[in-house]
């Protein structure tokens, strides 16, 4: 199988690239992305280029993907209760009480309090960890099932995945499917959760994760395919490249002259 991590420049046509790649496939394709806004953008691009989303292409947000393919089919190995969806959280969930030195949280052994609200909605910051636990308990059947359902998987906004998300990515990279990950580490906007696990790979350090944690897994690191920006001219690209020297020089496909091009510095009054 062919796995690939593509480091994309801002305005490089990432969405167009993903859609065109998916349109070339005859087998089942999954495109998953972190934000709802980007999911809608991908759907719009399919309509623009193809008139519709092809029947063999599924587009889901990362959370929806994990719930449908990781949680619901395998939750029985952990609990028999009915799960009533999820609840988005922006801080660590499962607080037991406020202690003298800060919040005290439920242990994972109390899984109902650790993973769920009283109404059995799963905390968003625990979904990936729950899926990883299912993967471990079933000896890899979660990733096996996903790979059989989708021989080709495209993960957009890879820079926003964190913590246990990365373990799920690692499992998929070892499964019988082609995984293409695309993202711009210079544009980390959100994190799926603030987990201590793999903290050193936060802020878009997916390349470092692949090189360090996936050494025995074949994965091409591609810094060329989406390295030219259609949005920014060379002055802007060169300035940006100086801020992120570790990613090399970004090129441009933007050659229009408007009279107000380039980088400007304003004075504070």
Map each language-model feature to its residues.
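Loop/turn-to-beta-strand initiation segments
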Residues: 28, 151-152, 176-180
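Conserved coupling/interface region of RecA-like P-loop/ASCE motor cores
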Residues: 190-201, 207-252
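Conserved RecA-like ASCE P-loop NTPase motor core of nucleic-acid helicases/translocases
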Residues: 18, 27-39, 57, 224-229, ...
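Accessory N-terminal region flanking or inserted into the helicase ATPase core
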Residues: 2-7, 84-154, 163-164, 168, ...
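P-loop NTPase Walker
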Residues: 1-73
């Amino acid at each position: 199988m062919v796995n690939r991590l593509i480091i994309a420049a801002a305005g490089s046509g990432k969405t167009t690239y993903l859609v065109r790649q998916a349109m070339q496939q005859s087998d089942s394709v999954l495109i998953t992305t972190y934000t709802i806004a980007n999911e809608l953008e991908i759907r719009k691009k399919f309509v623009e280029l193809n008139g519709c989303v092809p029947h063999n292409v599924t587009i889901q947000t990362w959370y929806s993907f994990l719930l449908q393919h990781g949680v619901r089919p395998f939750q029985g190995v952990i609990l028999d209760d009915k799960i009533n969806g999820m609840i988005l959280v922006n801080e660590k969930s499962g607080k037991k009480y406020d202690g003298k030195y800060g919040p005290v949280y439920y242990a994972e052994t109390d899984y109902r309090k650790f993973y769920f609200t009283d109404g059995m909605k799963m905390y968003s910051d625990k979904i990936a960890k729950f899926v990883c636990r299912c993967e471990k308990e079933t000896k890899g059947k979660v990733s096996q099932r996903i790979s059989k359902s989708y021989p080709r998987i495209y993960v957009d906004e890879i820079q926003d995945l964190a913590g246990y998300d990365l373990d799920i990515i690692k499992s998929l990279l070892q499964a019988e499917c082609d995984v293409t990950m695309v993202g711009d580490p210079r544009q980390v906007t959100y994190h799926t959760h603030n987990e201590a696990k793999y903290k050193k790979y936060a802020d878009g350090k997916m390349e470092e994760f692949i090189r360090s944690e996936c050494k025995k897994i074949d994965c091409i690191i591609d810094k060329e395919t989406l390295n030219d920006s259609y949005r920014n001219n060379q002055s802007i690209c060169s300035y940006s490249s100086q801020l992120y020297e570790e990613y090399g020089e970004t090129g441009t496909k933007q050659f229009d002259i408007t009279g107000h091009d380039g980088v400007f510095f304003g004075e504070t009054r």
